[in-house]
């Protein structure tokens, strides 16, 4: 039986976005809107939410606009280490990769982890060896080179202010979708935090923290100060409050983001529930976000 509601919501990260020029905002809006329209058409034609979130996130990974894939920021040793995760609410299948340096689309490899292995999370060299064994695209690290991100790293090193490093973590990408079969899926991908220690892993590849999907309840993708999002299992907590406290999607997600603010944690999240209601709360200067459902027209916002 077809689900009456369906749709998708995406984000391009939360953080200090007030320095984006009008031209930069327009370029980002164009990319997000084009991706949303293409993703929505897949849903409209009966495509699966899992395929849709993988598609949307891989589109953002291929763009230098975001802190994921090609646009990933640098560690303190001037290398890029990427994390990603994806989850299906149908049976809670989930896959993730962390600290990969040569994977063109970490989100695609994350999906392969649960489809082709008995594991959920593969890290570093092991993840890249797995990618080679299944023919997943491996690229030279030069593919990810970014003069802009190197300048950000050197600026961060000169400041040596932890709060600044956290605020600079913008651009993480994510997508959450509900399809016509009622299946909810979520996906998140990031380059992490500028000037992070090599090997540091945040919330993005941690199921329940950066990504969560649960049919008949909701799906969530988060962005922000990963250590706090891990401690409070933010993505799953949104769905838990809906399930056990009978909160609405908006109440649950907004309350959690405000609670994080009270303890000094910055960030935001995107979420969709079983009725295609959407919530996009954040406690930062801005969060790049957009959505489209069969009940609402395409929407894009930063602030």
Enumerate the predicted regions with their spans.
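Alpha/propeptide regions of enzymes that mature by internal proteolysis
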Residues: 1-303
């Amino acid at each position: 039986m077809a689900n009456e509601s369906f749709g998708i919501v995406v984000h391009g990260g939360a953080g200090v976005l007030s320095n984006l020029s009008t031209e930069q905002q327009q370029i980002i809006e164009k990319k997000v809107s084009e991706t949303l329209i293409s993703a929505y058409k897949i849903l409209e034609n009966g495509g699966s939410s899992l395929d849709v979130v993988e598609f949307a996130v891989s589109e953002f990974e291929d763009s230098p606009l975001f802190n994921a894939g090609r646009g990933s920021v640098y560690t303190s040793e001037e290398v890029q280490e990427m994390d990603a995760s994806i989850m299906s609410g149908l049976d809670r299948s989930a896959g993730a990769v962390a600290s990969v340096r040569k994977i063109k689309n970490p989100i695609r490899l994350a999906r392969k982890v649960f489809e082709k292995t008995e594991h959920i999370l593969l890290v570093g060299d092991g993840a890249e060896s797995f990618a080679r064994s299944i023919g997943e695209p491996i690229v030279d690290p030069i593919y990810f080179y970014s003069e802009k991100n190197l300048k950000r790293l050197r600026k961060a090193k000169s400041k040596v202010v932890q709060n600044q490093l956290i605020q600079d973590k913008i651009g993480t990408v994510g997508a959450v979708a509900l399809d016509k079969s009622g299946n909810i899926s979520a996906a998140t991908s990031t380059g992490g935090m500028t000037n992070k220690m090599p090997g540091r892993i945040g919330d993005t590849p941690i199921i329940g923290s950066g990504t969560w999907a649960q049919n008949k309840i909701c799906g969530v993708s988060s962005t922000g100060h990963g250590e706090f999002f891990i401690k409070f299992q933010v993505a799953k907590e949104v769905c838990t409050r809906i399930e056990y406290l009978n909160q609405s999607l908006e109440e649950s997600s907004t309350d959690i983001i405000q609670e994080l603010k009270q303890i000094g944690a910055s960030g935001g999240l995107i979420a969709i529930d079983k009725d295609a209601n959407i919530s996009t709360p954040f406690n930062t200067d801005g969060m790049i976000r957009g959505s489209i459902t069969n009940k609402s027209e395409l929407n894009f916002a930063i602030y």
